[in-house]
Amino acid sequence: MRRFVWVSLSVLALGCGSSTSGGSGTGGNGGGGGAAPQSLVNGLRVSEVSIYQGLKIPLEVEGVPVDPRPTPVVQGREALLRVFVQPNPDWQPREVIVRLELSNSQGLVGAQEIRRVVNGGSVEADFMSAFNFDVAATDIAPDTTYSVGIYEVEPSQTAPSPGSRFPETGVAWLGALDDGPQIKMVLVPVQWNADGSGRLQDVSEAQVEKLRQQMYKMYPVRKVDIRVREPLSWNQNVSAFGQGWGELLQTVLYWRQDDLKNNVASDDEYYYGMFNPSNSFFSYCQQGCVAGLSSGSVSPKDSFLRGSIGLGYPGEYTAGTFVHETGHAHGRLHAPCAPFGQIQSVDPAFPYGDGGIGTWGYDLLTHQLIDPGGASKDMMGYCDPTWISDYTYTALFNRIAAVNGVADVITLAPQKSWQTISIAADGSLAVGVPFRVRGTPDGEPREVEVTGPGGSSRTVTGYFYPYSHIPGGMVLIPEPQAGDRAVRIGGRHLAL
């Protein structure tokens, strides 16, 4: 949940993805016909090669490959590749050619060259001080290799400097990993009938595209697939401070389960219910509000929890809530950043105490670098502006890969019916919706006392899933038997 209280450059592309982020404003007439220049440069070396797919992923530093990588290179996802250069003390500024070659098991895929004057060393924050190549998604494959070299514009008899090419000979492995073809999202417009208005959300192509772009920029995916479902009619109140949110979330999750049963949804789809409980965001949230809700999904096999809800008012904040809540549905807890420190369910393993992003970010759509020392914080906190940390990015990659890659294994587990018991913020209990779950749930085990026929008592194990932003959650218990009359959880009694 969230709460409220380039410069275009000239580049020569040779049979590879076009480059729109790098190069020189005055140069751009590099080697022709795809052949590499003849003479490696003297007095200048490749100090670093990094690739950016939302975050910076260093590939080599001072001639040494980075292994292991801090975050994965995602197969089939477009990228910016930056070549950093460092001159020797006696370097005389002059024009050089930096060439990137990409290959695969079949040979050379293509090459790009950038030609411009080098006056000094590359600096991360100075975009134009590095040589920046856009790499097409199709050129980032499991068998992709690369090499970079700095060449003299004119043939030279001077011996090249160490480090003028990486690797010194041959090619280096790019190391792209696969997490599946896409992330699938289903928007569920909630027709708001609690006040008799029948109010619906903006699910126009333009608004859906805002959601898609926000998720694509941050999530480690090739593609974000979004479809819009038929509306869900809702007659109950959902208050700004949490009452009614859990009931609506469970209903959206139950609709997903029903759609699966009727073969109109797939198990790898995440549902997102959008609702407008007032005419405007301000009128609903003028004194603060809950903006979205999910249930913490511990394991990839908790497919029944692949859903969230959030406010659906037009604007950028809806997109921010969308990616935040979907992060919860992928098992992410909160990053430790919120106004006045008011935040629950903080991830104890989050590596940055201020909720920061940890490394340089890069917006693939606006072509802007995001400074980790700046204002941006991880999207799983409550602070704005947001980006994504390397910690969250890697965790999402692993979860998305599991969802896309282990479906055949998951279907081998038998399905059983489990009854949901809702726990409200005040600890009171209510009977929720039933879910079909494969295998044993992975929530927190809770002891549940069941009162059976004739007042008999037995103890069963329930599994608790907390809500992402409000107190409470839901406990899954084995389907009640005939004659079961009541349950007791944490000292609270509920008649069935």
Language-model features and meaning:
Residues 139-164, 448, 480-494:
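Short, aromatic- and glycine-rich surface loops/edge beta-strands on solvent-exposed regions
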Residues 46-97, 413-443:
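Contiguous beta-strand segments within globular domains
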Residues 175-344:
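Active-site-proximal segment of zinc-dependent metalloprotease catalytic domains
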Residues 121, 138, 304-386:
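The catalytic-center signature of Zn2+-dependent metalloproteases
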Residues 106-126, 230-233, 456-470:
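Solvent-exposed serine/threonine-rich low-complexity stretches and specific carbohydrate-binding patches
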Residues 376-427:
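Catalytic cores of secreted or luminal carbohydrate-active enzymes
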Residues 154-194, 493-496:
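Short beta-strand elements
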Residues 1-39:
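Ser/Thr-rich, Pro/Gly/Ala-heavy low-complexity intrinsically disordered linkers and tails
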